[in-house]
A protein has these predicted regions:
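Glycine-rich phosphate/pyrophosphate-binding loops
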Residues: 1
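Hydrophobic alpha-helical positions that pack around
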Residues: 5-132
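Short amphipathic, charge-patterned alpha-helical segments
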Residues: 133-139
Length: 139
């Protein structure tokens, strides 16, 4: 298992132990389970309907749209929300500080931040959060 997978699995186990996910979340009578599914990593599976096909055990190829919009007809024909990791990474900060604070970062036409992966023959490979509209590749 890759380091990132280990960290995600550990974080999910900690969330279950703390009562943030699972049955009767924090005594609210609301329950949700999260299942981690490690894909093969094919680029095309980044397209939401291809990801759903892969999760269903099929070849990870995009479905024809319409009528297959995941919010109405997704995993096993059920309504499905598909988010990328960058969207999910922004949620804790947004929920803590609010949309106005988030949109105050960056530029007027490109507010907020984004994640970028730097790899190859570079001095500091990794995943970085940058402010939209202000950082260049040279930086």
């Amino acid at each position: 298992m890759a380091l990132a997978q280990e960290r995600v699995a550990t974080a999910l186990n900690e969330a279950y132990a703390a009562g943030y996910v699972g049955k009767n979340i924090l005594g609210s009578k609301f329950s949700v389970d999260i299942i981690l599914h490690w894909g093969a990593g094919a680029y095309v599976v980044g397209e939401e309907t291809a990801l759903i096909e892969s999760l269903e055990g099929n070849r990870g190829m995009p479905r024809l749209k319409p009528p297959f919009f995941p919010a109405a007809n997704g995993l096993y024909g059920q309504p499905t929300i598909v988010n990328n990791v960058e969207t999910l990474a922004n949620l804790p900060w947004l929920l803590t500080h609010g949309v106005a604070a988030y949109t105050a970062i960056g530029t007027k036409t490109s507010p907020g931040t984004r994640m970028v992966a730097v790899s190859g023959h570079v001095k500091r490979p990794g995943v970085y959060e940058i402010i939209n509209g202000t950082t260049t590749f040279r930086d």
